Amino acid sequence: MAARRGRRDRVAPPPTGGPGPDPGGGVRGGSWASRSQAPYGTGGSVSAAEQVHEEGNDSSFVSLSRLGPSLREKDLEMEELILQDETLLETMQSYMDASLISLIEDFGESRLSLEDQNEMSLLTALTEILDNADSENLSPFDTIPDSELLVSPRESSSLHKLLNLSRTPPERDLITPIDPLGPSTGSSRVSGVEVPLADSPWDFSPPPFLETSSPKLPSWRPSRPRPRWGQSPPPQQRSDGEEEEEVAGFSGQMLAGKLDNSVNNVLDFPMHLACPEEEGTAEGADAPASAPGDESISSLSELVRAMHPYCLPNLTHLASLEGELEGQADADADELTLPEGCVVLEIVGQAATTGDDLEIPVVVRQIPSGSQSVLLDESLGSSPALQLLMPTMESETEAAVPEVAPCPDEELPLSSACLLEPREIMESLTPKEPQSLPASASQGSQKVPRKGRKKKNKEQPTACVEACTRRLRSSSRGQSTVSAEVNSQAGSSQKQPQEELQREAAALQSRGKPRAWARAWAAALEKTGSENLERSAGQDSPAEEDALDLCPKLLETSQANPTLSLNDSAQADSMPVDSVEGDSPAVGNAAPGDQASSGTELVGSLPVGPNLTSPVLADKKGIEPAVAIPTSDNLSPADVLANTVAADPVPNDPAPADPVLVKCRPTDPRRAAAAAAAAAQGSRPSLQSADHPKVVSPEGKDVVGPLKVEGSTSATTQEAKPRPLSLSEYRQRRQQRQTEAEDRNSQPPVVGKWPSLPETPTELADIPCLVPSAPARKTAPQRSPIAVPETVSVGSNPVSPTPEPSASKLMVSTHSEQVSSHEMPLAVRPPPPPLPSVSPAGPIPSTVPAPLPPFPPSVPPLLPLPSGGHGVPRLPPPPLQPPGLPVSMRQMPPDPYTQYAPVPPWSCYPSVSPPGYSCLPPPPTMPIVSGTPGTYAVPPTCNVPWVPPPAPVSPYSSSCAYGSLGWGPGLQQPPFWSTVSPPPLSSVPTGRAVPPTPVEPSGDPAGPPEDVLPGPVTPSLSSGPASPAAPPVEPTKPEAQPVPVSPQPKHKVSTLVQSPQIKAPPTLSTEGVVFEESVSERLKSETQENRPKEKPISTAIKSVPVPKQSAVAKLPAVHPARLRKLSFLPTPRAQGPEDVVQAFISEIGIEASDLSSLLEQFEKSEAKKECPLPASADSLAVGNSGIDIPQEKKPLDRLQAPELANVAGLTPPATPPHQLWKPLAAVSLLAKAKSPKSTAQEGTLKPEGITEAKPPATACLQEGAHSPSPVHVGSGDHDYCVRSRTPPKRMPALVISEVGSRWNVKRHQDITIKPVLSLGSAAPPLPCTATSQEPLDHRTSVEQADPSAPCFAPSTLLSPEASPCRSEMNARTPPEPSDKQQSMRCYRKACRSVSPSSRGWQGRRGRSSRSVSSGSSRTSEASSSSSVSSSSRSRSRSRSRSFSPPNKRWRRSSCSSSGRSRRCSSSSSSSSSSSSCSSRSRSPSVSPCRRSDRRRRYSSYRANDHYQRQRVLQKERAIEERRVVFIGKIPGRMTRSELKQRFSVFGEIEECTIHFRVQGDNYGFVTYRYAEEAFAAIESGHKLRQADEQPFDLCFGGRRQFCKRSYSDLDSNREDFDPAPVKSKFDSLDFDTLLKQAQKNLRR
């Protein structure tokens, strides 16, 4: 900024670039820098302002916009303000980064007296901006004070202010150079802004840029005759020239301390940048400086209108700071023109907010490489902003950037994010590339309207990419923003190669110049990004080139998703950006040249979709996506990943600066979007090839079903451009944006709107039938490019979103993820189904993504969200996984992937789309992500091969519960896989993994799709803490492995469950979340493998992905935590008896047929204090429970998949509900939870319940709880049968599985939301066996006190605890009840799940359970379980009302399972005396109690009322009998006793009252016993007054009452304030009337 101003003023600004008191440039420069920054961060004018806010300058810039008019009005005041310079600086410091402040200060230092004035103007403008920016520009990413957040966007007003204030005629401004504050014409007009613009250096002839720019300006902004510069167009041209010089000379000043007027070749973008449409079209023809300036002003207004006011204000402020930039726009642009490598992106619109209408081109002006380079070099040294802009390639990028800004909004938000948190933007180069790309697109589109610009963006991908690169470099610290920008730009231009980008950049440069404010923004970015740039300064040049290399790939990705970019620069691009950020870190390979080429292809398809989905999900879920943006191409994929990972945990870490993960705070949608953008760039190349159509479709337009869910997520991401923001800031801005977005959307200048954060879906997405899911699975391969990548993105993006939540975890995961990440992209690239399968097999982080890929086809969006991190990413755990996953996807191409290239699973999953599974290896990526590096490695083996991964089991186990997953041994076998499936889920993954399982059912080759799904889901559920139990669970085989599984899973699950539950941050974070995803995917694969005997696993995985996407689609509506719970729900699915048990255990806590049942479950669980396990512990332990569930549920899984779907009522069409209710249904029920259908259904229903009833922690717990419980619930009516049958044998180890299975009951599948993790840990060992007989009782007790028996208790306990309330509170412990308990709970959960219809289901289910139990002994056993579940559900509901339900459950447990089942089943059943009666009586007892209470109260009230009525009647009687005497004008000193004494002379007084009034006479009422006494008092009462008193005003009291009973001022009633109805006479003394009257009076 200082440099630019210096060039403008022909004074070398201080190398630091502090704002100098430029005649016109000081303020203007400062403003410009601010603006420059703001656009960078905001993706539009507002973006700039917001970015400034983020940096602290954002606010000042916004203020500048508002300050503009005041500056014009107060040109002299600006000087006065200079006096307040220090104060202003102090004020701004809170809002501005030290760099910007230093720029301002430095400006003053290096400037002449002119600079002092400029500084004054700048300070004034900045101060005003800071004061007003908040209200003016509400950017989700702005670090603007609450005031701005609270203030609604001043769209038009800000724009007009800015336009009016921002530009004085060029002549004025140009004249101003002589008189910095100078001639009042320009200086007074722009005050601070104009002053800086008007500098002696401004006399330089305008550079070609301004000329080019000014022609543009006319198109979108008619040239105004405003003499902003105080000089004629020539001065403006000089300004342009100066501006160019400033870019070059900026560096020169910074470096050489002199303006380089020769930098005329630099094409600067003046206001046309701010108003790209007008500027680009009209201004392009008018080169006159004055015209541009005038047009800038006029155009700025138009620009402001075009863009959202909040956006424009930033641009406006920038323009104002720019010294009425529009008038001087060209000159200013040159001044602001960043150094050679710098890319100045001027975003007129805020794509994030506006979405498609973001037409504000991000003007990345390429300064001549020659002079610019030198200046830039020095500038880099002096000015961070310059450093950022300096990258060697920046000149090329700059050339490209100048006019290509199709998604300036996105870009700006990205820039804003970058500027806001440079520390978070470790990869300055790569992020710069993305930003440069958008900048280039912005410039390209600048000439045309924003839409046209968007098209241009596509047309000019090279320039865009280059510009993005420039910009990314410029705003290294705004990498998130850069990524977003690049994403938006990449969508259209990333396809093109570097050379193309460069050529296009040159063309774009000739086409249009970056605006002055864009340059200022670039300068600001340079300053802010300088840190990052410095970090990557060594690699800046190479990194620049690498970035360009990456940029082309990114462009490829972007072009792969042109629809996204085109769809909505803000929305689609933002979303892609988010995705890219989330995935790009993983695709970090794209950052390095080598990585870019290899990783781009690999990550290309994979990252884009997944990342897009993941970022969106993360955004939607408020999870902070970590974006790893490789800084240099030289980094290897692994290096990039490592850097990304490191960057994610330590965004500011210089070492991983290249592929640094840019974390977006979960609550910062913009930042998430930015991260997504960064990831998207890396992943977009792949997407473009395979996923582009779908990714773009879902993200841009939700074309694909799975992508639809993703699209909504993407839309969210797109809407909210990720930008480093604190959680509080993000929340504030989100709220603001929600309110403001509405206003802005309604307002014409929607283009500049900030993307409004999409609200978490409150309603469950329609759950596709599990059967349809299978087709969807097949579709998944088709969608693989999009769905799978998105899924992967989700998987990886969860890592990205998770980075912040689990920085350390991410780091751990990152290591493994790095390899798996890359592999995952490959897997993702293949059809989503394979990828999900691969993902599960691969790194856990991939697991979530892998599930997501399957989901994209149908259920994926819904389920993947919870399981794949799409839904889960919102959850805190998913975010952990996303960081590693994206990185892994990108950076770890084939390590785990190749390692675990479990081609068999993918081979098994050929139907899923073996082509898509060309990346089979990627699935192993999941394992890597899943655990720490070791852990992830294990899951991959299990995940991909599902049978072959025995070896990885140990790593899995080592990682956490995941290691214990032992998928290698058990996964290979169908039962084992099912069992294994749950273990991965045990940790946080439980929720996530489960969703993948639901997907499985649709495509499950073995048995019902749901069957397949349960397996994978169960593993997912158990994957985490249950991982240790997983190996035992893995032996899903009913009896053979039950013992090993039983002891190990139980023990390990308990340990892991408790460990992850309570303290699974490392495991849970990395494994929990990442592993969850991995397990989810892997469990899917496992389950499917078990079902198809390893071959179907692939198919199952495929099917799982499809249902998952469906679930994902629904899940978005559900809260992230709830989504995770949903994920968990499907997880519990046992292939064999043990699997069934484990499925039950796994699902115990998470069962829920629908939201209502979920809520019920949750309520019961919470209400029930029997399960003391902490929600968090349960949440952590969810994975453990999940692990067990899959094994237990596997046998039942196949049958239950359809049945569960029907039972849950989520996919009734797909599966006949009664089919699975048969004895086989027991297994089916258990597996149902895992089945894709049930998972999807549960995901759908359960998200509802979870969303409503369970908090995120509760959701996790419920996931864990439901992991064990699914077996029971999953069985549905047969659940109790299966449960009873299975509990004794495998209950100890398989309880979790059983639980998972339990909740798989048709209704229960969604009902089972209780995480059985904790419960599983505490109660599983004991309840396992005992629960069979008394599952409810044990579950209740275990639930309350024994977190060590999660397997059994979870299933049973979860049933009651599965209720929304209980799920959270008791879900942790309840999942420990015996299988029966779990079954009962599942059953009950099913009812609860369905809540409204769930209760009806309860009866039906209970009856069904009874019939089933009587049907067969196994069914009987399961039936008792189911019936217990039903009872539990009943109690759960009761529990919702009171805490008695736990006791009821206990009683129920005491009762025979069968009896209990029947009782629960039919509340009218005689056997329900104990349990059903209890629960019922409890509920009734509460009623009776309340009733008695009410009666008592009512009685007392009636008595009181009666008394009141009696008094009223008495008074009325007395009044009517004329016994009440009204005494007025009572002296104030008189007391009631005195009054009574005085009037007692006339007779016996029954009552005497005195009423004192502040105003008016005091009065009283005296009631005599006899009327004659009253008459006497009235006649002679006046004689009683004393000499000093006024005569009493005597009359019969209540005379007003006679007229109007309700008016009691003078009534004797009034003295008592009796509420008795005045209007009712004694004759109308009936109780009702009196009561009504009394109430009425009381109201008065």
Swiss-Prot record:
Keyword Nucleotidyltransferase set for record: no
Biased composition (Basic residues): 448-457
Biased composition (Polar residues): 437-446, 475-496, 556-572, 811-821
Annotated Gene3D superfamilies: 3.30.70.330
Annotated Gene Ontology cellular component terms: nucleoplasm
Region Necessary for interaction with CREB1 and NRF1, residue ranges: 1361-1432
Pro residues bias locations: 12-22, 828-864, 874-884
Region (Disordered): 1-61, 170-249, 429-616, 646-761, 773-884, 978-1074, 1322-1507
Compositionally biased region (Low complexity): 213-222, 515-524, 1409-1433, 1453-1489
Protein name: Peroxisome proliferator-activated receptor gamma coactivator-related protein 1
Species in which this protein is naturally found: Mus musculus (Mouse)
Gene, per the UniProt record: Pprc1
